[in-house]
A protein has these predicted regions:
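Internal, conserved structured core segments that host functional sites
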Residues: 23-97
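A structural-propensity feature for long, helix-poor, extended segments
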Residues: 141-160
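Charge-biased C-terminal accessory regions appended to nucleic-acid-, cytoskeletal NTPase
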Residues: 158-216
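A charged helix-plus-loop insertion that forms the helical arch/lid used to bind
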Residues: 9-25
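Small-residue-rich helix-loop
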Residues: 130-139, 143
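Conserved mixed alpha/beta catalytic, RNA-binding, or beta-rich assembly cores of soluble enzyme
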Residues: 101-126
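Short, small-residue-biased leader/transition segments that mark boundaries at the very start
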Residues: 2-7
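Short acidic alpha-helical/loop segments enriched in Asp/Glu that coordinate divalent cations
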Residues: 92-95, 118-132, 157
């Protein structure tokens, strides 16, 4: 019956939430470190694709990322990466077309992660590294990090575009682009599900080799 279906869903969700609340701190640290490494690696791969020499520096950051990114390799990598992509005058946070386009694309990605994580029964507010009590989507903000490069690729070279409805549609369409994950091609929207489930599996026992990495 419909009532028993609702009850089962609620029961499943409470079971998932219990699992989430029981994740060990050392497992969360290991998984967050793996996510940071993957993010920097994707940035490195994009710069390498563009033949930017800075990709070598990012490679050293991947290798040098410590547990919980104690030495802030993520922050250092972001500076090098955005300078290489958009020039030394580019600053994240400035009110420019590029920043507006990046933010719009990132929001689309984050929404897809929110849907996936909530659909699996996890609480999006209980993050690994993002822990703001005012952010309902801390966990999504953690998991989305390596996927941001997909937006960066879509926005790169579009400096002369206008923020038209067509351009917004172009950015929305990133969820329908194909990427490779688990040795098969999937649209980004489906790849997010495969990746998110693999992260949650890794959080159960701290085995970060379970995390599935996508390729462009």
């Amino acid at each position: 019956s419909a009532a028993s279906d609702v009850y089962k869903r609620q029961h499943d969700c409470s079971g998932v939430l219990r699992r989430q609340l029981n994740w060990k701190e050392e497992h969360k640290s290991a998984v967050w470190t793996a996510i940071v490494r993957m993010k920097i690696k994707k940035q490195m791969e994009f710069l390498s694709e563009l033949c930017c020499p800075q990709s070598e520096l990012l490679k050293s950051y991947v290798d040098g990322t410590e547990l919980n990114d104690r030495t802030n390799r993520e922050g250092h990598a972001a500076k090098v990466y955005f300078d290489a992509l958009f020039g030394l005058s580019f600053k994240r946070g400035d009110k420019t077309f590029l920043n507006g386009a990046l933010n719009y694309g990132y929001t689309i990605l984050l929404s897809a992660f929110n849907r996936e994580i909530a659909g699996l029964g996890f609480n999006t507010q209980l993050g690994l590294a993002h822990k703001s009590e005012f952010n309902q989507f801390n966990l999504s903000c953690d998991l989305v990090e390596p996927f941001r490069v997909i937006v960066d690729k879509a926005v790169f070279g579009k400096d002369n575009c206008q923020f038209t409805p067509d351009f917004k549609r172009y950015l929305c369409d990133i969820l329908n682009r194909e990427i490779k994950i688990d040795d098969k091609y999937f649209v980004v929207n489906d790849a997010i599900g495969i990746y998110a489930k693999s992260v949650f599996n890794a959080l159960e026992d701290g085995d970060t080799s379970k995390i599935k990495e996508y390729e462009f």
